[in-house]
Amino acid sequence: MKVRLHYKKSRFFLSWQSTFVLLGTILLAAVAAFGADSATVIFSLDFPNSDPEHYSISVQSDGHAKYESSGKVSKDSEDDESYQSEFTLSNATRARIFDLASQSHYFSGKVDSGNKKLAFTGAKKLVYKDGQHDTSAEYNYSSQPTVQQLTALFQSMAGTLEFGRRLTYYHRYQKLGLADELKRMESEARAGELAELQSVKTILQQIYDDQSVMKVVRAHAKMIMDMGDSGSH
């Protein structure tokens, strides 16, 4: 009986040991698969003496995005200030970005037009990273339609996020500046010049909920929020 009991315990131990090994193998395989499927597209622009002078947008294949910029937040600012914001892209925009990156051969070839006669519109850079690629391209202007579309999309997103940056500043330090800023934002949104309005919903909601802000200003904030929720921009 003692021998049998010992044998059963050993077999039980080995069974659990095998289970842990199997689970570990499955977990490692899942992590490897996630790494293989995970991809990132980054767009950055550096344009001295503009506002902002620098910004970058990093987009992951799961839709998570991060925006960083530096520049003067208002005309009264003496020094450049850095700004960061994290948000989730709409499924449509996320899919479009990675589709355009694929059509652009993940920026592995020549992207810049090479035309030195064109005006300088900022040093732009596109980066693509996944399990099989780590490629990038720098350009002032590209004649490739897919790169042009990506550039326009990222610039429209940056326009929205810079409105968010300024609205955050005005709401905290200069509420009288909110009216003109929101009017301009609504006008540009209706003209199709802004993208991913939901990325700045937090500050718009804060303005709308602030009873110390004029009703007409809060109404503009609500209007822009509704436009973002409807996915019209």
Regions found by a protein language model. Give the residues of each.
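N-terminal secretory signal peptides that target proteins for export/translocation
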Residues: M1-W16
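Bacterial N-terminal signal peptides
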Residues: S18-A30
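Short, well-ordered, aromatic-rich surface patches in folded extracellular/luminal domains
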Residues: F34-N49, K110-H233
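Extracytoplasmic
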Residues: S38-T40, P52-H54, Q60-D62, A92, ...
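N-terminal targeting signals for Sec/Tat export/insertion, comprising classic cleavable signal peptides
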Residues: L45-G71
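A short, structured loop/turn motif at beta-sheet edges
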Residues: D62, T88-R96, Y128-D134
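A short, surface-exposed interaction/processing loop segment used at functional sites
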Residues: A65-D79, S156-R166
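A short-motif feature that recognizes glycine-rich, charge-decorated loops
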Residues: E68-G109
